[in-house]
């Protein structure tokens, strides 16, 4: 929030939203489109996993995700789970019930996010649970992974990689056509009432992982 009582105190420099990165050449080679939902993500992963992406003769991975405990894995799980939980914008809340303060984790939406998060490991490196952000960045830039959840940092880093330069694209994080209905406490198909912000029936909930950065000048 840049303003308090209508007065500007800081200027936003970095939103720190997670983005979805993918290898354009790999998806094209296997006739795949960038996934818009997590269901589509798994179809793409199944089609491309275990193929050689960087020409070294070794099988590579459809996905790299940072999941190391006591590191930054919580950013990944919330980026995955958010579209199942929050359907009506930021006023609804994704971490807590905004009216009661109750954590929003014991519900079908977060459970579905955990299921997806776990299943992603079927298409990643064997040691994925011990990988943090620097590990997955390195693997992606070496051409070992075709899909990646990351901040904007990867974009300029990829420009310096002889392996992936000009061979990658980005989009918003995958969403879902099925979401948690808080009234019925079930996963249900999106409709205009349940998912008013959905695009073509797909609910997205972009996650500002790490919050962001802003700048200010001390008046003293």
Where are these predicted regions, by residue range?
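Short, well-ordered alpha-helical scaffold segment located
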Residues: 25-26
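Glycine-centered hinge/linker elements that transmit conformational signals in sensory
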Residues: 45-47, 89-130, 172-178, 189-199
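Short helix-initiation/N-cap motifs at beta->coil->alpha
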Residues: 38-44, 127-142, 175
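Paired acidic/hydrophobic, glycine-rich loop segments that form the ligand-binding mouth/hinge
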Residues: 146-151, 169-170
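A local structural motif
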Residues: 7, 29-33, 102, 118-132, ...
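Short glycine- and hydrophobic/aromatic-rich loop-to-beta-strand nucleating segment
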Residues: 18-22, 215-217
């Amino acid at each position: 929030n840049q303003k308090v009582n209508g007065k500007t105190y800081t200027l936003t420099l970095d939103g720190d939203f997670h983005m979805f990165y993918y290898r354009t050449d790999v998806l094209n080679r296997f006739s795949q489109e960038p996934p818009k939902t997590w269901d589509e993500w798994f179809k793409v992963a199944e089609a491309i996993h275990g193929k050689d992406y960087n020409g070294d003769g070794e099988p590579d991975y459809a996905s790299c995700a940072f999941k190391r405990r006591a590191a930054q894995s919580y950013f990944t799980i919330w980026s995955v789970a958010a579209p199942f939980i929050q359907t009506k914008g930021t006023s609804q809340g994704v971490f807590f019930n905004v009216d009661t303060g109750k954590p929003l984790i014991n519900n079908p939406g977060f459970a579905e996010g955990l299921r997806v998060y776990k299943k992603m490991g079927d298409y990643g490196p064997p040691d994925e649970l011990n990988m943090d952000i620097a590990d997955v960045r390195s693997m992606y830039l070496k051409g070992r992974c075709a899909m990646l959840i990351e901040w904007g940092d990867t974009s300029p880093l990829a420009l310096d990689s002889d392996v992936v330069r000009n061979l990658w694209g980005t989009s918003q994080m995958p969403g879902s056509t099925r979401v948690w209905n808080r009234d019925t406490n079930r996963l249900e198909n999106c409709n205009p009432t349940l998912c008013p912000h959905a695009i073509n029936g797909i609910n997205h909930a972009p996650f500002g992982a790490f919050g962001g950065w802003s700048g200010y000048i001390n008046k003293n």
